[in-house]
């Protein structure tokens, strides 16, 4: 496999108002395998429409991610956006396949949906359900905090928010620090595996 160390990204916004930060911004119907990301610093701040931050992919859309690890990294999605996600492996997943992947000792912050592995899983895009096999998250810190009183703050030990059915096989999360402390959101929650 390959290792990428000390990578940085500040989340450039595209013409459609999406800001993404990660080794890959979007992985659409493609695959990433045998990759380790160590000591990355990925951030998305400012104003716009959508903000996604992930250690491997900001957005995994009908993608295959296998044998990948993200460790010792800082992943922050703090844009004043409609949808705001950060996750150790992917910020946002829809119809993606994850196998033999790990999120280890990462610091993850989001204004809305933060997860040690994936920030938000939403499979309502007609590409099938996301699947997770032999994946884990350990020793990560996840914080979800916003100043918007009408907002939502979810911090999950594996996934921040799950919108639709997913398939999980032999996946686990432990030794996580989860927080929504200081949020002004009217709807806030933490969950050992998923916040919502």
Go through each PLM region and give its residues.
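Predominantly extracellular beta-rich ligand-binding scaffolds that present long acidic/polar faces
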Residues: 1-196
């Amino acid at each position: 496999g390959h290792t990428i160390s000390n990578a940085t990204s500040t989340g450039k916004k595209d013409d459609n108002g999406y800001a993404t930060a990660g080794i890959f911004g979007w992985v659409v119907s493609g695959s990433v395998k045998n990759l380790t990301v160590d000591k990355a610093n990925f951030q998305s701040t400012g104003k716009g429409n959508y903000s996604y931050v992930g250690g491997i992919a900001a957005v995994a859309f009908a993608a295959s991610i296998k044998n990948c690890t993200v460790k010792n990294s800082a992943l922050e999605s703090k844009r004043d956006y409609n949808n705001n996600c950060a996750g150790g492996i992917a910020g946002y997943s829809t119809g993606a396949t994850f196998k033999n992947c790990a999120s280890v000792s990462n610091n993850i912050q989001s204004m809305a949906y933060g997860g040690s592995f994936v920030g938000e899983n939403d499979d309502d895009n007609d590409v099938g359900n996301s699947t997770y096999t032999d994946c884990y998250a350990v020793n990560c810190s996840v914080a979800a905090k916003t100043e918007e009183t009408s907002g939502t703050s979810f911090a999950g030990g594996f996934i921040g928010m799950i919108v639709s059915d997913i398939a999980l096989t032999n996946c686990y999360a432990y030794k996580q620090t989860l927080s929504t402390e200081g949020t002004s959101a009217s709807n806030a929650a933490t969950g050992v595996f998923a916040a919502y």
